[in-house]
Amino acid sequence: PKMPTKEGGGEGGGGGGCGCHGPGYPTPLDAMNGPRERLIYVPCILTGTGTQKPDYLATVDVDPESPDYCKVIHRLQMPYIDDELHHTGWNACSSCFGDTTKRRNRLVLPCLNTSRIYVVDTGTNPQAPSLFKVIEPREVFCKTNLATLHTSHCLGSGEVMISSIGDLYGNGKGGFVLVDAETWEVKGTWNRPGDEAPQGYDFWYQPRHNVLISTEW
């Protein structure tokens, strides 16, 4: 995930902090012509390395005019080991461009190994993000019967959707967890109960065409 300015950004820039529009850009062409990123956030995985240390989120300075160009300027360590952070996503994106109340200031980090979900505050101090919320696996299991969380994407509805690969018992199950992006409580599943795919993996959607495409591991 990327952030072009101190005020917001990521996934094509535009944090939505100006009050004239929501986050992101109205079109892909506008995104291509937007300002370049100054910071990027990189999940760093120590799970399975034998170090018994938690994964962390690295902040990298990618501003060519900065004295810290191409350097890791901050590391946010997770509170638990063996999480295996995976495909991160924002709390709000271009799907909310028309909503002036939305701001891209939270980074969502699902975990493959533990099914935990971390929510990181990138808005208060983009150079040194902090842990905002931890959604424990028990809440995910009890409300969705899904596990092994893979990819997080924000929706125009103000929710965050996270794909799953399996269930609590180790079976393959491709479903979608819905999280409220204001309260950060698990709401349930986007798919109807019993309507999961045999396997899950990545996904993306195109709201203008009312289409969602998902893949399997």
Describe the function of each predicted region:
Residues 122-207:
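Asp-box/WD-like beta-propeller blade repeats and closely related beta-sheet repeat scaffolds
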Residues 32-45, 57:
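An edge-strand/N-cap motif at the start of beta-rich repeat modules
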Residues 57-62, 120-122, 179:
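Hydrophobic/aromatic beta-strand positions that recur at structurally equivalent sites within the blades
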Residues 49-53, 112-115, 168-173:
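Short, solvent-exposed loop/turn segments at conserved positions within beta-propeller repeat blades
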Residues 69-154:
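Blade-loop segments of beta-propeller domains
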Residues 4-9, 15-36, 84-103, 142-157, ...:
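Structural signature of eukaryotic scaffold interfaces centered on beta-propeller domains
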Residues 45-47, 110-112, 122, 165-167, ...:
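Short loop/turn segments immediately following the C-termini of beta-strands
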